[in-house]
């Protein structure tokens, strides 16, 4: 296994602010090490005023590419030379690849969501989904689920100043994919009860339950059945209060670790041309997350 940096070592990384908490360097560097791939992946905390310079540096430094996290996914989208059709539909990018000194923007978050479901033998094709929350990760999951042939998607979002714009964005995805996507107010009790009865998959994309937060994203936990697949996009903790409660109904539960790694695996493939050793990476991450919990 390679453990030294030379003049031939390639560079990739992630840009966000804040970024010091990111698991992306561990994910990619673990994969490089397992594959003996001569590259290093770093985290770059960049201020808004410097973001465009940082994007240009991907070309200047001949980097393989860069991952983008909050709050720069839309800014990166606007600065790319080319975009995949998937990225155009979602409207933001999380991966920028340096292709012949042109920046190609893509969004692998939705692919990561689908990949995490496949690990459990779950498909969205022909299924009804309920999505709690409508942030960036949710939008990518909604878009990819529609592209993969979901039957119908119910989205529950807080009725704040972004409600109408998000609704318009999702209507665009609905038209492009010919999949019915309905956006409801987060506390629309009648709509949530109907959606849960119709749905196979229930997905939490809110931050409720993250870290030491013990709040549930759903009041109607009694409507979760054994036939449901319950997904939480949170991976810290690995088992949120939402998943613990869903387990009591004997539903299949899936945490966000798989989505995190699979979205990285697609980005890794775009940057390196290699297949990420997903099992080895997940094994390493689980050890690290348990260690952090014990600190």
Residue ranges and their predicted role:
Residues 150-176:
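NAD(P)-binding Rossmann-fold cofactor-contacting core
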Residues 2-120:
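Phosphate/diphosphate ligand-binding glycine-rich loop within oxidoreductases
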Residues 5-6, 124-125, 147, 218-227:
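Short, conserved loop/helix-junction motifs that constitute active-site signature segments
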Residues 229, 233-295:
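Adenosine-phosphate binding glycine-rich loop
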Residues 18, 158-161, 236:
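Residues in the short beta-alpha loop(s) of Rossmann-like NAD(P)-binding domains
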Residues 16, 107, 126-147, 157:
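Glycine-rich adenosine-cofactor-binding loop
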Residues 179-253:
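Rossmann-like adenosine-cofactor binding region
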Residues 147-152, 249-252:
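Conserved S-adenosyl-L-methionine
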């Amino acid at each position: 296994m390679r453990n030294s940096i030379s003049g031939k070592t390639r560079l990739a990384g992630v840009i966000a602010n804040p970024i010091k908490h990111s698991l992306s360097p561990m994910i990619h560097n673990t994969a490089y090490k397992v594959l003996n791939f001569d590259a290093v992946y770093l985290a770059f905390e960049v201020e808004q005023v410097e973001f465009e310079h940082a994007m240009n540096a991907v070309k200047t430094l001949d980097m393989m590419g860069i991952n983008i996290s909050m709050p720069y996914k839309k800014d990166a989208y606007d600065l790319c030379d080319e975009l995949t059709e998937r990225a155009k539909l979602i409207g933001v990018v999380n991966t920028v690849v340096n292709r012949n000194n042109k920046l190609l923007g893509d969004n692998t978050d939705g692919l990561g969501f689908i990949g995490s479901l496949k690990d459990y033998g779950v498909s969205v094709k022909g299924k009804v989904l309920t999505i709690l929350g409508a942030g960036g990760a949710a939008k990518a999951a909604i878009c990819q689920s529609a592209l993969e042939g979901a039957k119908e998607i119910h989205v529950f979002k807080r009725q704040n100043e972004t409600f109408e714009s998000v609704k318009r964005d999702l209507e665009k995805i609905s038209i492009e994919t010919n999949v019915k996507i309905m956006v409801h107010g987060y506390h629309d009790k009648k709509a949530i009860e109907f959606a849960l009865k119709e749905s196979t998959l229930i997905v939490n994309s809110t931050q409720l339950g993250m870290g030491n937060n013990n709040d549930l994203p759903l009041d109607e936990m009694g409507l979760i059945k054994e036939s449901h697949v319950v997904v939480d996009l949170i991976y810290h903790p690995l088992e949120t209060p939402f998943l613990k409660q869903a387990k009591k109904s004997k539903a299949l539960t899936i945490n966000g670790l798989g989505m995190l790694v699979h979205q990285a695996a697609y980005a890794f493939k775009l940057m390196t041309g290699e297949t990420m050793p997903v099992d080895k990476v997940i094994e390493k991450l689980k050890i690290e997350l348990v260690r952090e919990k014990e600190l």
